[in-house]
């Protein structure tokens, strides 16, 4: 079912991609080679906006799948549009040369070192100077190319914030080195590991790495693991990329009931901080300030009431005045804040302001009027 869905998405969107996709030969000084690369630029690209950059190895196999999912999620799920580059590696089995590692050390072989520099010092800088890219940069690879992405984690600052690693053919000791590095790196990282149903030594190493990654309890490390027992080396790509793409941009989705129960209600921090951190992270990673969802406002309001965290109502009220001007939202929440503090006069004046403004969501003028009448009765105004 999932596979058919994403195949449909691929067909739907790839039919109209011609004008947005270009293929060219990239002259690499580092490799001393001419490499085939393919670019996807959103059709409504604007130099005034910032776009996450996605680097896709095994471009012949993965590029179209990644583009289709990017278009689908940006159109229907509100995730940001992305700039995508695919590096072709099929001819002459270049992928095995580009991503080769030494069997004894597990580190890149000579050609691998040059390919590492080609991506990091030539291809990516070219795209970042040509287009207005966001700080958020993603790596997508499969098998040997998936393993190669891990090497960027060992730089002082990783070139990539996000990794979609599909059935990686892990170099020696990588199942231990990657978790150890992710546990110590001072950087927000999104890591999605995917494995199919193949039974081999690689699978055992992947499952060992998964166990170690799941044990990391650290702010800023976002890890997901998906296993598809019936998938083979071909279908795993179709199964895996769609779900992984959604998880990479999960912060763009409205706060879900599960998130509300498991993350917000259980947190010992002020409720408003959760909302503030969410939107600050989006701005830091993606380079723009996302409009606050009304759903998220209501989730934080409900949690503030449930946890008797009335201090969170004050900053929430100020945010609502900015995001939803002209509506009751900000002044109504502020009125409840003063009401909780026992400041009757301030609360009454604030509810009067709310009464004069437009209704929104569950808030009605009748509710503001009831608050005003109750305050007058309680405080004898």
Please provide the spans of the model-predicted regions.
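Bacterial Sec-dependent N-terminal signal peptides
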Residues: 1-22, 191
